[in-house]
Amino acid sequence: MTTTYDPFHPSYLDESDLREEMDRVFDICHGCRLCFKYCTAFPLLFEYVDSFDDQDASRMTPTQQDAVVDECFQCKLCYINCPYIPGLHEWAVDFPRLMMRAEQTMVAKHGTSVKEKLQNQALARTDLVGKVNVALAPIANKAISKPGSLTRRIMSKTVGIASQRILPPYARQRFSAWFRKRTTRQPATVAGKQGKVALFPTCLVEYQAPEVGKDLVRVYERNGIECSLPAGQRCCGAPWLHNGDVAHFADQARDNIKVLAEAVRQGNDI
């Protein structure tokens, strides 16, 4: 059994090692139960373990373990509130990253279906999807704004986005476009040392909520902090990682690290 959350660790994709680690963590979670209200993964986990007379989490079958994994959607509320996380406790529990390890192990062992591959390609290419939908914002927003509509039902069948889920609308202008078109970029002069930051806007701010980034820039500049937006940034790659595709995630992470590392060398905070 190896407690590791490093996707390049030699035991990371070892299924038997993973199953033993899930036994350990599930037993801790069952004894704690602090996270019963955060997502359906925990009530399902507790239901399985409670069904055993001795309440031994290691008696869960691989199918039951996988069912718990499927319920996790990486909101990370459990991690924020967990008293046993790495660095704070010797048990080093990181439930979201363990679920991610399980997803990646299953993909490495069993692969994915053609439908899943197509869905992953559609959902993980957030920069492409974002650029297209911002350019067609009036049309795109009308198409996705009504839960349960024909368009949303088609999306549910094809790319796997639940038809009843409320989706954030796309902006008519990307955050990066707004930032580079501004006529006044210099921060206000204030007493004390002036700082410098390089912004990493995230896909949500870049394509759907640029007002969040705009407010951040205005607050920083009002307080004498110079803002820059390094060119060449990409999606953080989280959709690839959550789909079990470490290779694509690592490619995007390397690109972002290269860009942001240069910004740090120029004296910026991120």
Provide a role label for each language-model segment.
Residues E21-K37:
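Mature N-terminal segment immediately following signal peptide/propeptide cleavage
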Residues D27-H30, T40-L44, E221:
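Short amphipathic alpha-helical segments enriched in leucine
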Residues C35, T40-L45, C78, P83-G87:
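Detector for the c-type heme attachment site
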Residues D23-F26, D56-C235, W240-I270:
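Iron-sulfur-cluster electron-transfer modules
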